[in-house]
Amino acid sequence: MPKPAQAYEPKIPVKVLEWIRPALATFDAVHGGQQLRLFNAHYDEYGFQPIVVFDGEGRFITAVLRPTKRPGGKEVRAFLRRLLRAIRANWPKTEILLRADSHYCSPEVLDWCRANGLDYILDVAPTTTLRRHIGNLEASTKARFEAAPKEGKARRFKEFFDGAASWSRVERIVARVEAGAEGPDTRFIVTNLKVRNARVLYEDVYCRRGQAENHIKSWKTHLAADRTSCTKATANQLRLFLHAGAYWLMWGLRVSMPKRSMWRVAQFDTLRLRLIKVAARVVEMKTMIRIHLPTSCPAQDILRLVLGHIPRLVT
């Protein structure tokens, strides 16, 4: 007997969780009386601010509907606890690195990650205490840029141990100091990783979280995940899950493409317009439904390849 078609399995072999706080590009504006909506002064609108999680390769993990306000440490810890329980139930040996911005860098999160064996690298909001460590470095970096402005921005790094008064212990802090024509720019991150080089920690580990904004764009813009017009919060949460399923289908379609082809990095809307929106003739027969595709269409070769991979998307 022939072997059944291999189903596409949503494995999570990678070690990084991209924890995204929906910011400027992901504000979910609403125009009705939906539950959990709050007013956002920045946008001058009512809306939601869901927590969205991806892994390091773009797999969709989860999305939780919530009001448009900064989450507290206890809320974040409770969310992390449920998320880790679900991951460990299926992938008990997967190592997890949590990357997130300063809105999630709270003492509750730091203590919980340490107690549960999670690696983390989080953005830290600048404070007077932290700036005391890099005052001289900022001055020398600015002088270096002014001495040779044509060479571009000057960037330097420094690491030290310090912490906020609310933290239970001091943490390893990495400061990135940059000077350019636009003025000085300093960022701080906190981490428990063993990587020694501060530049590698910031540029090769932390900065990769910027790719998550592209995942957010694919989910929200190309798949219309911001259509949360139901009155009940549970109904809008279900909408997020349905759009998560759509994301998985499109992501699975994209990763089935040849590795060195343009389709492997194509946006979801490109895949939909070029490969999915193809005219076809559907014929209903007694024992089957036959689909007749056009004899010619754009990207016909890649379409033929995609049709051969469709069984992998069946779950």
Range-by-range predicted roles:
Residues 110-119:
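Short, surface-exposed basic-aromatic patches at helix termini and helix-loop junctions that form
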Residues 98-106, 126-128, 234:
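Acidic, metal-coordinating catalytic cores used for nucleic-acid/nucleotide bond scission
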Residues 249-315:
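A short, flexible helix-boundary coil/loop motif
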Residues 10-28, 58, 97-105, 120, ...:
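Short, conserved catalytic/metal-binding motifs centered on acidic residues
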Residues 1-52:
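Active-site-proximal, Lys/Arg-enriched surface segment
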Residues 119-221, 280, 307-315:
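An anionic, glycine-rich sequence signature occurring as long contiguous blocks
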Residues 197-238, 242, 246-254:
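Short amphipathic alpha-helical "interface-anchor" segments enriched in bulky aromatics
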Residues 38-91:
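Electropositive, glycine- and tryptophan-enriched low-complexity nucleic-acid-binding patches
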